[in-house]
Amino acid sequence: MKYKRIGAYLIDYFFISVLVIMFSQIKVINPYYDKYLDNYEVYQDVMDNTNVDNVSDIYKNQDYLISYQNVIKYGSFVSVMSMICYLLYFVGFQKWNKDQSLGKKIFGLKVVDKEEKSPSIYRYVLRTIFLYNLFVTILIIVLAFILSSKVFLISSIAINIIGYMFLYSNFLVFIFRKDSRAIHDIIAGTKVVEVENGNR
């Protein structure tokens, strides 16, 4: 079942990523698109003109610090829209679709709670937040608006490292547990089970 879950995850991730990319490119939907591109250009220029041997110099470069923070700020609209898409798909659609996302439907899987019943919306929200590291995105967006540029850079690096560590730990727990429950399943009180052919 582990391979089926990985396959379902990849299908769902691809589907939702394409959806988010499509929406984020529409200027009418994203009023900060041009400001994001302007700041990203400054950020990229600093990166391109930085000597690899003196990479620590970028942390002293005020243009880099400000442009990096602004990229996150003006990109927050897309990040929030992305989170809404994740929640609508993995909470709303999956709950409505008999606890199956498109990927799970294809591989004959579904999400249940510990009693093997349909999970509550609350459990689905918890599951999605931790499965897709949305807590990292939320925290970084909030900090981008309240911290100074230098403190924000250091904080965002630390938070991203924690996020990646959680992501890898989540995968390892899933691989080595006999019941195939990952950390997000344990936190949300859910598990993924195979569905009989007649009930797909």
Where are these regions (language model features)?
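Short, small/hydrophobic-residue-rich motifs at membrane-helix boundaries and re-entrant hairpins
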Residues: 1-144, 157-200
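Membrane-interfacial helix-loop-helix connectors in multipass membrane proteins
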Residues: 147-157
